[in-house]
Amino acid sequence: MITPQQAIERLISNNELFYDEMTDLMRQIMRGQVLPEQIAAILTGLRIKVETVSEITAAAAVMREFATKVPLENAEGLVDIVGTGGDGAKTFNISTTSMFVAAAAGAKVAKHGGRSVSSSSGAADVVEQMGANLNLTPEQVAQSIRQTGIGFMFAPNHHSAMRHVAPVRRSLGFRSIFNILGPLTNPAGAPNQLLGVFHTDLCGILSRVLQQLGSKHVLVVCGEGGLDEITLTGKTRVAELKDGKISEYDIRPEDFGIETRRNLDEIKVANTQESLLKMNEVLEGREGAARDIVLLNTAAALYAGNVAASLSDGISAAREAIDSGRAKSKKEEFVGFQPQQRCHFLGKMELG
């Protein structure tokens, strides 16, 4: 067992923590057994030293261990569409829009997200703005996935142990290991993922982490300029985990017959209301940059979720899902989802 003080000493000496040590330390943090000042020192030490694949893997495994899970009989076909945030791009909610298009094209989407930290609109903000219920129980999220093909998991509802860390993170004011742990800890256990990151170095790192955590088919992407999505403005770095192996390559919009844009101004928004408006325009079939970036990211989600055989096939499926009106209908179905209620008779008989 490693004590918090021993961990701090190791980190300030620029030495990494071994997997078992990081596991033990993270469990202590999640149980509330580490002082806030010590957590701050640990997060600072990890950031300065730079977190290793082993340290991130251990921390993510413990967060999964402590998470309130979504009870699904079979999570094999699930895909998560998520980003680390932190890119400062102020774009509309691309991955959330892609969630509806992907589900309309046949994917089972288990999306994990929270409120805005650095963006104009977080995934949870826009889901709430459209009228959906953020506070479903884990059982109700599972119902939603079975019934609509989409489950949205509001991160604070599934990671209550993070209450021991949240005040420290806010007070530090810089990115820490926890900024990349959230997307690695899907409570529904989705084995397939489109994961956007804010730096190209993280593509290789997080693909290796997810490999060690047992993920099946993952695309970790970083758009030119640090966008945590597949971008329209140039190349996107991709690290793909498939069949246990990792390959890295670059893609560009023109590879798929999509116009490269000079900038992202057309898809920037100031707040959640503007983001929802942009989302609705895409789902209603309006042409433009917003539609194009959703096509690219939906294609990657469909490919990661093994619904499409390739990114090119994914583009075609995404386009058809929008143009047929099915993507718009899928959003309405998700927002209108009403969980089945169990009936209790005299506190003894349960029907349902």
Swiss-Prot record:
Keywords on record: Amino-acid biosynthesis, Aromatic amino acid biosynthesis, Glycosyltransferase, Magnesium, Metal-binding, Transferase, Tryptophan biosynthesis
How many cofactor units bind, and how?
Answer: Binds 2 magnesium ions per monomer.
Q: Which residues bind anthranilate 1?
A: G83
**Residues bound to 5-phospho-alpha-D-ribose 1-diphosphate:** 83, 86-87, 91, 93-96, 111-119, 123
Example GO biological process: L-tryptophan biosynthetic process
Q: How does it assemble?
A: Homodimer.
Question: What family does this belong to?
Answer: Belongs to the anthranilate phosphoribosyltransferase family.
Matching entries from NCBIfam families are given as: trpD
Name of the protein in its database record = Anthranilate phosphoribosyltransferase
Q: Which organism is it from?
A: Neisseria meningitidis serogroup B (strain ATCC BAA-335 / MC58)
Lineage here is: Bacteria, Pseudomonadati, Pseudomonadota, Betaproteobacteria, Neisseriales
